[in-house]
C-alpha cells in the first residue's frame, strides 16, 4: 500500500509540472492538533514567492476537490532551499559529491544517523563516505535525508 506522501505525489505531480515546475517532494507532518502538508517545488531558474503562491492556489483547489486528507491541515508550498530534503534516488544521484545528513528507519552498523559525502548511487543503494569509511545504505531504509549546505 502506498504511503500518503506517495499518493499525494501521484495526485499533484502532473499539475505542478504543467505549471512549469518540478515536484521536488512532499511531507505530511502531524504535530498534536496541527498537521502540515509541505509541497516542495523547484524550477530551472529557482522559485519565487509568486511561483509558490501560484502552485499553492492550484494544489489547494485539487486538494479541495479530491479530498485525500480528511483532517484539517495547513498547506505550505516552498522551494527545497539550500538544505534541501532528498526524496528520490535520482535526487541522491544529482548530488553525488555533496555532503548529506541521513536518518534511517532501522539501524545499519548500529547507527541510525549518518553525515557524510554522497559517494555513489547504484540501484536503490546509496554509498555515503563518513569519516573516510564507506557506508552503503538502502534507499528504502532512509527515513529522512537533507543536503548539508557548504558555506566555505
From Swiss-Prot:
The cross-references to SUPFAM superfamilies, in alphabetical order and at most eight, read: YhbC-like, C-terminal domain, YhbC-like, N-terminal domain
Q: Which InterPro entries match?
A: Ribosome_maturation_RimP, RimP_C, RimP_C_sf, RimP_N, RimP_N_sf
Q: Which GO terms describe its biological process?
A: ribosomal small subunit assembly; translation
Is the Cytoplasm keyword given for this protein? yes
The protein's UniProt keywords, in alphabetical order, are: Cytoplasm, Ribosome biogenesis
Report the principal subcellular site: cytoplasm
Localisation:
Cytoplasm
Tell me the NCBIfam families matching this sequence. Answer: PRK00092.1-1 (NF000927), PRK14640.1 (NF011233)
Q: Which family does it belong to?
A: Belongs to the RimP family.
HAMAP family tied to this protein: RimP (MF_01077)
Q: What does this protein do?
A: Required for maturation of 30S ribosomal subunits.
Name by which UniProt lists this protein: Ribosome maturation factor RimP
Amino acid at each position: 500500500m502506498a504511503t500518503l506522501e506517495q499518493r499525494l505525489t501521484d495526485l499533484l505531480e502532473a499539475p505542478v509540472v504543467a505549471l512549469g515546475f518540478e515536484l521536488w517532494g512532499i511531507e505530511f507532518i502531524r504535530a498534536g492538533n496541527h498537521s502540515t502538508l509541505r509541497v516542495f517545488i523547484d524550477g530551472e531558474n529557482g522559485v519565487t514567492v509568486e511561483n509558490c503562491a501560484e502552485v499553492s492556489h492550484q494544489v489547494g483547489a485539487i486538494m479541495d476537490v479530491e479530498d485525500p486528507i480528511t483532517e484539517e491541515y495547513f498547506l505550505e508550498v516552498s522551494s527545497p532551499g539550500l538544505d534541501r530534503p532528498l526524496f528520490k534516488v535520482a535526487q541522491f544521484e544529482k548530488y553525488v559529491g555533496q555532503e548529506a545528513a541521513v536518518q534511517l528507519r532501522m539501524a545499519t552498523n548500529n547507527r541510525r544517523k549518518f553525515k557524510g559525502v554522497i559517494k555513489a548511487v547504484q540501484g536503490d543503494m546509496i554509498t555515503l563516505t563518513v569519516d573516510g569509511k564507506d557506508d552503503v545504505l538502502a534507499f528504502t531504509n532512509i527515513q529522512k535525508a537533507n543536503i548539508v549546505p557548504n558555506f566555505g
